[in-house]
């Protein structure tokens, strides 16, 4: 049976130190895998180790926890767990600079998820993105300027490579070019660890995804991210990640464990869209079981809707307190 007191002990305890530091309480045809560059530009030392991850004191989860009546141990635990700050069109260089600067002042690593590629989400529940390639390049320039020399982790364009098949040939090439541009621009700050999103193991074969990652010069980044906003188990994603790593000159990777505590929902058309019965996964940590896994992270923010899901759910990105509480309950 779920115990609210137990939930706090299990979920918030690992991050009291973070909060204190931050000054807060609160398969298809065979694929030809393109060659990866022989020399990695990123230092092999884990850039996510040795410092806590930043807790956003102004997140939707934090606001919900602060205003919960009666108080919710589950919401407090989730709010005080480090999660990604999503950068979408409209976010300014000043916004990025303030967020990363606040994290730096707190002695913590900020985690950003950049989500603004043209034709984003192929017109699905999180459709949007910048209108043109030039707009996107200028936006990336602004983000890089905002990050500056701050030690930062970046998840670059969730789903963009995995979803590229929905595009025309010209649009697909433009997408590869834009992600490559973002990798090159963001990694000019040697303290920025960039992870290009690589989908998950049920979407593309390791060979296919490695080929896509090599096309965007993943070897110039720290590596790639897996399972973003999805539910596949950490063990399964480690197997997938190690296979991709072997095809991308030893790239490192991170895994989104925010909602994978009991794995995915049974197969169905929209089993990824606000499925019931899912659970919080391992809290963020750089202590992993994968040889090339830098960290388990909460990239998706637990409690935020995946979209309307063709059933009248709240729009994508809307924080729903009961959904967050249900994820905590399912985690036990």
Segments from the language model and where they lie:
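N-terminal export and membrane-targeting signals
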Residues: 1-17
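C-terminal region of N-terminal signal peptides and the immediate post-cleavage residues
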Residues: 6, 21-45
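N-terminal carbohydrate-binding/catalytic regions of secreted carbohydrate-active enzymes
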Residues: 46-146, 301-327
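Surface-exposed substrate-engagement region within the catalytic domains
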Residues: 56-79, 199-322
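Extracytoplasmic/secreted envelope proteins and their assembly/folding machinery
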Residues: 93-100, 104, 137-144, 176-183, ...
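Sec-exported extracytoplasmic/periplasmic mature domains
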Residues: 101-105, 115, 144-148, 183-191, ...
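Structural preference for beta-strand elements that scaffold enzyme active sites
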Residues: 107-111, 151-155, 191-195, 221-225, ...
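Active-site cleft segment of glycoside hydrolase catalytic domains centered on the general acid/base Glu
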Residues: 129-149, 158-192, 200, 206
């Amino acid at each position: 049976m779920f115990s609210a007191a137990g939930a706090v002990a299990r979920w918030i305890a690992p991050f009291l130190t973070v909060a204190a530091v931050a000054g807060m309480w609160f398969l298809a045809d065979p694929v030809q895998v393109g060659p990866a560059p022989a020399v990695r530009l990123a230092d092999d030392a884990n850039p996510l180790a040795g410092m806590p991850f930043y807790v956003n004191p102004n997140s939707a989860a934090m606001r919900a926890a602060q205003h919960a009546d009666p108080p919710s141990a589950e919401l407090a635990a989730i709010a005080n767990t480090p999660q990604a700050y999503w950068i979408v069109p409209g976010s300014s260089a000043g916004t990025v600079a303030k967020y990363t600067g606040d994290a730096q002042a707190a002695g913590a690593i900020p985690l950003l998820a950049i989500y603004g590629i043209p034709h984003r989400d192929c017109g699905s529940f999180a459709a949007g993105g910048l209108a043109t390639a030039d707009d996107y390049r200028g936006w990336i320039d602004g983000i890089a300027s905002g990050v500056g020399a701050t030690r930062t982790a970046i998840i670059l364009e969730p789903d963009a490579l995995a979803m590229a098949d929905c595009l025309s040939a010209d649009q697909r090439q433009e997408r590869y070019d834009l992600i490559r541009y973002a990798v090159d621009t963001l990694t000019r700050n040697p303290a920025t660890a960039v992870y290009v999103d690589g989908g998950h193991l049920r979407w593309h074969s390791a060979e296919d995804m490695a080929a896509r990652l090599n096309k965007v010069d993943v070897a110039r980044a720290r590596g790639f991210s897996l399972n973003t906003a999805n539910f596949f188990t950490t063990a399964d994603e480690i197997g997938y990640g190690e296979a991709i790593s072997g095809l991308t000159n030893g790239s490192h990777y991170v895994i989104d464990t925010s909602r994978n505590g009991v794995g995915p929902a049974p197969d169905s058309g929209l089993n990824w869209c606000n499925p019931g019965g899912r659970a919080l996964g391992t809290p963020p940590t750089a202590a992993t079981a994968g040889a090339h896994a830098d960290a388990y992270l909460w990239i998706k923010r637990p409690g935020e809707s995946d979209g309307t899901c063709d059933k009248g759910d709240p729009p994508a990105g809307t924080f729903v307190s009961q959904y967050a509480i249900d994820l905590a309950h399912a985690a036990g």
